[in-house]
Amino acid sequence: MAENNTKRGPGHGPGGPRGGFRKPKDLRGTLSKLMGYLGRYKALLVIVVILLFISAACSVAGSYLIKPLINDYILPGDFIGLAKMLCVMAGVYVVGAVCSYGYARIMVHVAQNTVAKLRADLFNKMQKLPLKFFDTHTHGELMSRYTNDIETVSEALNNSFASLISCSLTFVGTVMMMIVLSPILTAITAVMLGVMLLVVKTIGGRSRRYFAAQQKAIGAVNGYIEEMIEGQKVIKVFNHEAAAKAGFTGLNDTYRDAATRAQAYAGAMMPAMGNLSHINYAITCCVGGLLAIRTGDLGGLSAFLQYTKQVSQPITQISQQVNTILSAVAGAERVFEIMEAEPEVDDGKVTLERVKENPDGTLTEANYDTGAWAWKKPDGSLVPLRGDVRFDHVVFGYDDRKIILHDISLFAKPGQKIAFVGSTGAGKTTITSLINRFYEIQSGTITYDGIDVRDIQKDSLRRSLGVVLQDTHLFTGTVADNIRYGRLDATDEEVEAAARLAGADGFIRHLPDGYQTVLTSEGGSLSQGERQLLNIARAACANPPVLILDEATSSIDTRTEKLIEKGMDRLMAGRTVFVIAHRLSTVRNSKAIMVLEQGSIIERGDHEDLLAQHGRYYQLYTGQAELA
């Protein structure tokens, strides 16, 4: 809408790091919702848990087999038995490796399908949200839900959940076997593990703080870069390159400092844990060696030392995986916030349908474009569509504290062209958005052929309205596909006819592949005027009974505007047309011109009547005032 600026804000771009740690607000509730998505894979998840148990058991058992390997075969010199035992150990490790591969593959399948469903549900939910929702959420914020947050969930499902269970099982199994081998050495190791846990908590806590600062800083950098890229022309016109560089340097330095501190603490974790592990190993060797001399259990000492190496690894990994999972749950929570947002309300029962007239004069529904429409009431009766649109004392505001439109009343008949003139923010686009029911009014009524638009299903209502917005938007695809977006079942001939009607056929045929020329997003290879012509052709393809032109020629030069005037007149013939004017020359032939100021209609009449009033319209037309 013209009155609303596009929501873009720094700090929400998709390029932000995922290293920052975020705790979920409702851990249990969000996990429950995630489990709802994973519930379809219960059988596979049971298999994963079984494979995890087997894999962890093999890892623990493999180390324990070192004891009989040394005591029963190496020391006695039983090399045949040694060979057999080596084969047993190899078999144990092979089984563990196969199980690890198996659960990893299954989790990839489960994770990717779950994330695909989550992403699809999020996208589908977006299509059901009212425009008011997008007015209060930045583009970058919404994109981060699709990218950062869902990717964090994917990463956790792919690796972290299974790894957390595996590490926990391995840790418990290892500690149990250490107690079996030597309670004394286990007590020594437990003391060192306590020190390790303290180090993990201290370093991890500070690391998370600085990673959060890093994430905030990179968000600010991304937002600034996005803003500067979009505003390059303005920056160069006003010669503000130096100021732009200075602003970026400050943000970049802040990010550098935050990232340096975050990475310094994160990088200290592994060396600290490694050194503590080495100290623990050395102490265990000394004490264990003395015990082995007394008991002669060299194999038990060797097995215990192997467990000593293993036991510290799960501690670090469990801490890392827990943080990753909590971040993923926080990301999922943000996704579910959108999914639980209030959808667009549609209580309409009346529908608009394409119809054909039978020889006896009755109407029947048609599944192709007949150029005729009718209301289909709840009782199934069909009433021809006329195209009368009436506003009766309409009051509207985006919220109750800020009213945008005050007591708007107007009436438009088929074949009439109603124009809206006024300064930016006067409420011109808002009026046409209310016809579409993009927003709900506070009071008053808007009727379409005498039927309250709130009683009409929104999809049917919008299908009957052709809209050419002031902001052109083209999709990646062919020229024909972009025109056909107005009516997906349009034939190639109908697409070309719509282009000729809009005056776009000429330049389209000069494109490399004509109507099959592939356009990039937003039609970057076309001029602004050419993009707008395709927008107008799209509306012509829809062949609607009511047409809304939201400053449709504001981006077209005067020469191009002259080329399409006749086509636009043909497009508007017989239709109810609402025009939001950027150039007053485009509304001279309007049946009625509404002059708006601060949300109220202050003047109305045709061109000659308004000039005779010597009011606001007269000032605008004669150049005594400007459309600012």
Per-region residue spans from a language model:
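Membrane-integrated ABC transporters
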Residues: 1-59, 74-88, 103-107, 111, ...
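Juxtamembrane helix-loop junctions of ABC transporter transmembrane domains
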Residues: 19-27, 50-51, 58-71, 79, ...
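Alpha-helical membrane-protein architecture signal
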Residues: 27, 31, 35, 46-47, ...
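Transmembrane helices of ABC transporter permease
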Residues: 40, 44-54, 88-98, 159-213, ...
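Helix-loop-helix
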Residues: 78-80, 84, 177-191, 261-333, ...
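Helix-loop junctions and hydrophobic alpha-helical segments within the transmembrane domains
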Residues: 122, 126, 235, 335, ...
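An intracellular "coupling" helix at the cytosolic face of ABC transporter transmembrane type-1 domains
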Residues: 131-132, 148-157, 161, 165, ...
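ABC-type nucleotide-binding domain
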Residues: 355-628
